[in-house]
Amino acid sequence: MLERVLLLTLILSFVITVILSPIFIPFLRRLKFGQSIREEGPKSHQKKSGTPTMGGLMILLSILVSSLFVSFQLSIFSMDVLLLLLVTIGFGVLGFIDDFIKVVMKRNLGLTSKQKLIGQLVVAVLFYLGLRNMGLSTEVTIPATSLSIDFGWFYLPLVIVMLVGASNAVNLTDGLDGLVAGTGAIAFGAFAIIAWATNYFEVAIFSAAVVGAVLGFLVFNSHPAKVFMGDTGSLALGGAIAAIAIMAKQEILLIIIGGVFVIETLSVIIQVISFKTRGKRIFKMSPLHHHYELSGWSEWRVVVTFWTVGLLFAMLAIYLEVWIT
């Protein structure tokens, strides 16, 4: 029964996004909400300048409608769904403000790092308070074992690090057509399967809604992209994947399922440390996907390779949590 519900949720979310996009994209174009491309980025990206951005709004609306509709239809609407929506929409609003400043107010840097961090902290603390109100355990289980560690009050810093880290990691990864949408669909799909197998049904349904939304978006975001999700989408998806991991008690597994995002972030950190300490860059450009672009790979080849790596990470996570445990 639940398998059908998950599939129907995914399909509903997908259809909503596919229907909305042909209406929403021309609207964004009329408003001149076009993406500006950094001069220091790969030269091949300059032709993307002016492509409509803030497409993450379509993803958010699709997730909101499909998850609420299915939850109410099955009479399983709960604090779980509410908290997941709080994080997703909260980070989405933060991303929208950032996009608005860059696109409409023509301030290329958008929100300052401090302003963005404050917004992320506010959402993270509200999410944590909701978790405490639900009585969610502060224990963190080690995958493929029965061992767990009780973080106690240190669970709050963990929640903050996960939400802030994941949202920024997904945001960094969003640099090629279809890259985040594809890897995101795989990652959220893995969480849907794991949440279903471990009886976190509301989390599974929400995850399925996200999968459908990003797959629908991928139809218009794959190369050559007709629309970009912007920070509106990438920050929302990053916050959502961390919140799902926390709600499903798969905190450590997030590192594996989000392996592509972790690698992309590490490439930036390594590049910065190397340049500041040695005066040399390890990669031709960071994040890592740009390094491969400048090495002669086509954009599509880089994206498909990263999707494949993401799929392998997802399969490993499912194996560890579903088959071994």
Swiss-Prot record:
EC number(s) from the headed UniProt entry: 2.7.8.13
Localization, UniProt: Cell membrane
Topology of the protein relative to the lipid bilayer: Multi-pass membrane protein
TM annotation in the entry: 5-25, 57-77, 81-101, 117-137, 146-166, 178-198, 200-220, 227-247, 252-272, 304-324
Pathway where it operates: Cell wall biogenesis; peptidoglycan biosynthesis
Cellular component GO terms held in the UniProt record: plasma membrane
InterPro entries, alphabetized: Glycosyl_transferase_4 (IPR000715), PNAcMuramoyl-5peptid_Trfase (IPR003524), PNAcMuramoyl-5peptid_Trfase_CS (IPR018480)
PANTHER family assigned: PHOSPHO-N-ACETYLMURAMOYL-PENTAPEPTIDE-TRANSFERASE, PHOSPHO-N-ACETYLMURAMOYL-PENTAPEPTIDE-TRANSFERASE HOMOLOG
Family: Belongs to the glycosyltransferase 4 family. MraY subfamily.
Function in brief: Catalyzes the initial step of the lipid cycle reactions in the biosynthesis of the cell wall peptidoglycan: transfers peptidoglycan precursor phospho-MurNAc-pentapeptide from UDP-MurNAc-pentapeptide onto the lipid carrier undecaprenyl phosphate, yielding undecaprenyl-pyrophosphoryl-MurNAc-pentapeptide, known as lipid I.
Name recorded for this polypeptide: Phospho-N-acetylmuramoyl-pentapeptide-transferase
